[in-house]
Amino acid sequence: MNEAAVEIRGLDFAYESGRPALRAVDLTIRRGECLGLLGPNGAGKSTLLLHLNGVLRGRGQVRVLGMETKRVHLKEIRRRVGLLFQDPRQQLFLPTIEEDVAFGPLNAGWSGEEAHRRVARVLERFGLEPIAATSPLRLSTGEQKRAALATVLVLEPELLAFDEPSAGLDPAGRRDFIEIVRALSQTKVIATHDMELAYELCGRIVVMDHGRIVADGPRDAILGDAGLLSAHRLERPLSMVLREMTLRDA
């Protein structure tokens, strides 16, 4: 089996305005890996995520789970790649949470019985059963985030791509979400400004700026390089700094 979940070679992409968003991106992500994608606003992080399931298609080669992101493969890729948007309301558009979660299985061609079984299981897993009949508009941001993740995980994808998953969450909601993501065994790509989240969850860090990958390496090496991070408008995680101070003073 190919050990690479994602293989990207020479990827360039520009929006209709002509502004380049990705420039000569080369990236391999191994199966089972949790990769943190960091960078300032406009670095190209979200644009790169949207290439993983063919929402955007630039020049170059993108292979996901052994398939090129060409039209012939897009249905299968989108079934096996789950993308969680920064704003959960982009994924919650039906009258109730239960209907939103059921939308994917029913449109994937599964029987009503199989879809119901999967929906019930994922609602229970994320503690959404008590609010299953509730409109997404009446939920807190944390509940909306969990519901949006449920709409993705009900399809049992092999690769998960998160765009700013902690945005808008209060401390308790953020902690709950981190623990949910930590428990997931799938290959994960997390685009975020939340340095603490990246430090907690990701074993490998990629830094992007101006559409290019400017650094790629083990978590501690990248997040420990204050000069590198400062050059790209990022900061070291405070918990990492405090841990080093504690060890130094011990």
Annotate each PLM feature:
Residues 53:
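Helix-to-loop junction immediately C-terminal to a conserved catalytic motif
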Residues 38-40:
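The feature captures the beta-strand-to-loop junction immediately N-terminal to the Walker
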Residues 135-139, 143:
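Conserved ABC ATPase signature
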Residues 192-193:
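H-loop/switch region of ABC-family ATPase nucleotide-binding domains
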Residues 224-250:
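ABC ATPase nucleotide-binding domains
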Residues 60-69, 77:
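Conserved ABC transporter NBD signature motif
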